[in-house]
């Protein structure tokens, strides 16, 4: 604490804000001092209507995408809050979700790198080669997801469970549900890795932002959430069965994204 008072949730919020401010300052300073690709000050202050139109055309769908996706995931907690044993269910979901985010953080790094690679290939005019590159990178991400899934299951469901669970004040029911959720997450990681790399990396890198908007949100809003409402609030299935719904999004998203990937319609030269 360094002598500072305990701020609780307020402290967590302040720390998050400060980390984002530091992140912005570091990124902006690097961009400002970069010599290989110098930041043009006049382009920031007076970008021009043509550049502004392009920016809005490709950034607006991404903004809508992230807003809808974040809102959709928040609705999962709302649904759980209206179910039996809601406190145990939400506690298990919070812990399992954080562990899964820790394990899949590398997936988003891969997706960001793929976006750069795809955009570079399209920018250099390699429109034919980028199709095979995009496919290869997506299936590489799928293979990486298999490794991550096995690691998550081995570490947190079997080997490290006796050491991790006691660190949190979970009831016996919450611990059992957390284990079930982690098993579901571990099974879904290969599809999670594939679909994230495909949507965030390949489609967005190829300028196919409208398709990525639909592919990213349709499975969540028209698949996962309605099925969760049906099973959890109407049929009132056991919580262990309800946990299987966590995999639905990726089961629906992956084949839709694979179809778009094979079509080649995601390749757009926006330079």
Which stretches of residues belong to each language-model region?
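Short alpha-helical transmembrane segments in multi-pass integral membrane proteins
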Residues: 2-59, 118-188, 231-271
């Amino acid at each position: 604490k360094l002598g500072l008072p305990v701020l609780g949730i307020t402290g967590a919020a302040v720390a998050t804000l400060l980390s984002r401010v530091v992140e912005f300052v570091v990124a902006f300073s690097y961009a400002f001092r970069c010599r290989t690709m110098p930041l043009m000050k006049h382009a920031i202050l007076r970008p021009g209507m043509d550049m502004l139109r392009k920016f809005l055309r490709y950034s607006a769908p991404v903004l809508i995408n992230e807003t809808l996706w974040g809102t959709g995931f928040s609705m999962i907690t709302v649904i759980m809050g209206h179910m039996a044993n809601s406190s145990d269910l939400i506690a298990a979901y919070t812990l399992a979700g954080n562990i899964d985010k820790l394990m899949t953080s590398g997936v988003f790094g891969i997706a960001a790198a793929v976006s750069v690679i795809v955009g570079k290939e399209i920018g250099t005019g390699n429109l034919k080669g980028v199709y095979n590159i995009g496919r290869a990178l997506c299936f590489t991400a799928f293979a990486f997801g298999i490794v991550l899934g096995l690691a998550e299951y081995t570490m947190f469901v079997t080997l490290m469970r006796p050491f991790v669970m006691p660190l949190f004040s979970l009831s016996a029911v919450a611990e059992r549900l957390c284990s079930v959720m982690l098993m579901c997450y571990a099974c879904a990681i290969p599809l999670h890795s594939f679909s994230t790399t495909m949507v965030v990396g390949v489609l967005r890198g190829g300028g196919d932002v409208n398709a990525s908007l639909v592919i990213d949100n349709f499975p969540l809003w028209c698949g996962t959430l309605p099925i969760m409402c049906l099973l959890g609030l109407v049929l009132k299935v056991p919580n262990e069965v309800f946990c299987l719904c966590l995999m639905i999004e990726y089961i629906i998203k992956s084949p839709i994204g694979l179809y778009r990937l094979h079509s080649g319609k995601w390749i757009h030269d926006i330079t």
